[in-house]
């Protein structure tokens, strides 16, 4: 980052000396604008669960444990006032656990700066860290990638979620819970 500051300082000094062409050449050579092709992002629930399993329900940016989203939704089903859910993640309307513990897929190299939407560029992270990271690279944030966890050691409460649903099949009337239940069964079979 300091090299970039020195480059811009040199550019400003060249401008002050009336050397606009030299300043422009400095920018082009030392701190050029890079236009990246943006690729469409898309993944299925099955792909998400496969990634969460591969990462052992560990937030790859913090090393923290995350949990199967189905658990959160079941808690909201049973306790809508105490553990509210908002379908669009509105922080003022939903429990903070949906941000802190809800796993999502992030692109290690952001799509906005040329990263690809492919599994080798995916990492499990919390919604909160995903929002913080946004379109920034790990280097820009001075973050590092933590090792994946072991699904056999931490399954994100997936087995407990399946047991909970099978203990109260009324939960399957909620389409969201039903989707996560089916996806959970799939990854437990893998």
Regions found by a protein language model. Give the residues of each.
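A contiguous, mid-protein "functional segment" used to position or interact
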Residues: 134-165
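A boundary/linker detector
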Residues: 1-50, 54-56, 63-69
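Short helix/strand-bridging catalytic loops that position acidic/His residues to coordinate divalent metals
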Residues: 36-40, 109-113, 145
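Short beta-strand-alpha-helix junction that forms the catalytic/metal-binding core
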Residues: 56-59, 98-106, 110-131
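Alpha-helix boundary/N-cap detector
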Residues: 2-6, 148, 152, 175
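Short flanking/linker segments adjacent to small metal-binding domains or redox-active Cys/His motifs
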Residues: 163-190
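Short Cys/His-centered divalent metal-binding micro-motifs
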Residues: 67-68, 118, 122-144
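Short cysteine-rich loop/turn motifs with clustered Cys
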Residues: 45-102, 126
């Amino acid at each position: 980052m300091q090299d970039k500051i020195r480059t811009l300082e040199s550019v400003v000094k060249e401008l002050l000396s009336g050397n606009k062409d030299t300043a422009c050449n400095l920018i082009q050579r030392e701190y050029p604008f890079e236009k990246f092709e943006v690729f469409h992002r898309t993944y299925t629930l099955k792909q998400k669960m496969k990634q969460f399993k591969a990462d052992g329900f560990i937030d790859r940016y913090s090393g923290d444990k995350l949990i199967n989203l189905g658990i959160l939704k079941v808690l909201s089903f049973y306790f809508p006032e105490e553990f509210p859910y908002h379908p669009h993640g509105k922080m003022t309307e939903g429990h903070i656990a949906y941000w802190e513990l809800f796993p999502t897929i992030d692109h290690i190299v952001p799509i906005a700066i040329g990263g690809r939407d492919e599994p080798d560029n995916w990492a499990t992270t919390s919604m909160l860290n995903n929002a913080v990271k946004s379109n920034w690279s790990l280097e820009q944030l001075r973050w590092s990638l933590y090792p994946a966890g072991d699904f056999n050691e931490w399954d994100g409460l997936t087995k407990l979620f399946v047991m909970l649903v099978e203990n109260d099949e009324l939960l399957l009337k909620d389409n969201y819970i039903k989707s996560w239940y089916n996806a959970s069964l799939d990854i437990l079979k893998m």
